[in-house]
């Protein structure tokens, strides 16, 4: 596939509003929305921005070729992922350690199916991305949770509570780094402590690192769990979240230990689909050409974050920690002041996710990866609630 490198000089317009209605959008065409409503949907973690031109060209070239058969994962894609992980996350991996999969949630499910049983299950911190706690039911294993805590202006682990949970005998620790919904990019000392504790109790770390490229101003670098590996681990990476191609799927599991890798592959037999050619070519284009688009996106997201943060911090009954990564604001509300804030948002025409979905009471999660005019409209709808 041939792409024009001159595209990298383009200035992208993230203020452009694209109508996503009637595109089968999971976010915008939600069947539960009132008919003909002006609902602003801010629950689902995809972005309302047009992707990089090189991605669109890659898709056009596939379509013009006209054949959409089965595909293999080319060496060029494996090498591109390996290079990115080494360059951006400072982790040297082998090509043999890669297992290409349709998505990270199926990968997490396969990992838990491979490593747990009816008596020895999963431990994870809460609040957390909901598949992390739902997967225990999917694979029929116990779930142990421990609470995240506020440390100054960021969320982190209560490591004493974490160790108490590890003492109960789980087989897998599910880590979300950067954290969804807390927005934390775990620092080196935190990552080392996680690795040390899991090694002490012989617990395999399964790490979802899909938000690694969505670091905002407060975060200097993403530290992958693999940099301090003391025992077998599974780390998942994907370009889909940061480059807004989630609908195409595609991810890679890095599993350096051969025996663990074999277990993972056997557990996934029968329910992983092959990667489509669309997914493969888009990932290749993203690895090769996506960085200029991302470099323009991140300051725009930071400005959106700051606009929302300033509103929240100035509003009685609302609070949030400034995010280090992601575009998913985790907003706390005082029920005594605001009542059922999520329901009031819905009634005002704003759809945000209820915190209980992540095991966090009196919170909502709001996706601010949208044109600024749309975010301003959402803030005005929240003002109509909080000023009333």
Tell what function each PLM region has.
Residues 8-103, 110, 388:
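N-terminal small-domain helix-loop-helix segment of the aminotransferase-like
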Residues 163, 337, 343-353, 357-388:
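PLP-dependent enzyme catalytic core of the Aspartate aminotransferase-like
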Residues 94-95, 322-328, 359-361:
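Short Gly/Ser/Thr- and Asp/Glu-enriched loop/turn motifs at secondary-structure junctions
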Residues 284, 300-309, 320-332:
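Conserved glycine-rich beta-strand-loop-beta hairpin in the small C-terminal domain of fold type I
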């Amino acid at each position: 596939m041939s792409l024009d490198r001159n595209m990298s000089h383009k200035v992208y317009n993230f203020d452009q509003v694209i109508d996503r209605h009637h595109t089968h959008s999971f976010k915008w065409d939600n069947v539960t929305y009132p008919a003909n409503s002006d609902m602003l949907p801010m629950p689902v973690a995809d972005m309302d921005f047009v992707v990089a031109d090189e991605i669109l060209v890659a898709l056009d070239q596939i379509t013009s070729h006209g054949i959409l058969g089965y595909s293999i994962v080319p060496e060029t894609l494996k090498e591109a992922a390996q290079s990115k992980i080494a360059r951006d996350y400072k982790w040297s991996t082998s090509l043999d350690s890669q297992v290409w999969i349709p998505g990270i949630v199926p990968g997490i499910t396969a990992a838990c199916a491979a490593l747990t049983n009816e008596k020895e299950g999963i431990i994870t911190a809460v609040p957390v991305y909901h598949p992390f706690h739902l997967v225990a039911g999917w694979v029929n294993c116990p779930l142990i949770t421990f609470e995240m805590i506020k440390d100054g202006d960021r969320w982190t682990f209560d490591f004493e509570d974490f160790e108490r949970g590890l003492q109960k005998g789980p087989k897998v620790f599910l880590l979300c780094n950067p954290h969804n919904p807390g927005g934390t990019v775990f620092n080196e000392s935190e990552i080392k402590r996680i690795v040390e504790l899991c090694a002490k109790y012989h617990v395999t770390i399964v790490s979802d690192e899909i938000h690694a490229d969505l670091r905002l101003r407060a975060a200097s670098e993403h530290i992958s769990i693999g940099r301090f590996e003391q025992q077998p681990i599974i780390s998942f990476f994907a370009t889909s979240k940061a480059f807004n191609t989630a609908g195409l799927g595609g991810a890679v599991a890095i599993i350096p230990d051969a025996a663990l890798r074999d277990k993972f592959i056997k557990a996934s037999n029968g329910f992983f689909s092959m990667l489509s050619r669309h997914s493969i070519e888009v990932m290749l284009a993203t690895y090769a050409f996506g960085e200029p688009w991302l470099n323009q996106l991140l300051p725009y997201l930071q400005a959106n974050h700051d606009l929302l943060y300033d509103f929240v911090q100035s509003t009685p009954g609302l609070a949030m920690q400034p995010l280090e990564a992601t575009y998913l604001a985790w907003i706390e509300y005082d029920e005594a002041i605001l009542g059922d804030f999520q329901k009031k948002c819905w009634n005002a025409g704003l759809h945000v996710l209820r915190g209980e979905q992540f095991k966090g009471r009196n919170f909502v999660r709001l996706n601010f990866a949208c044109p600024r005019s749309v975010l301003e409209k959402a803030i005005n709808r929240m003002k109509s609630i909080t000023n009333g």
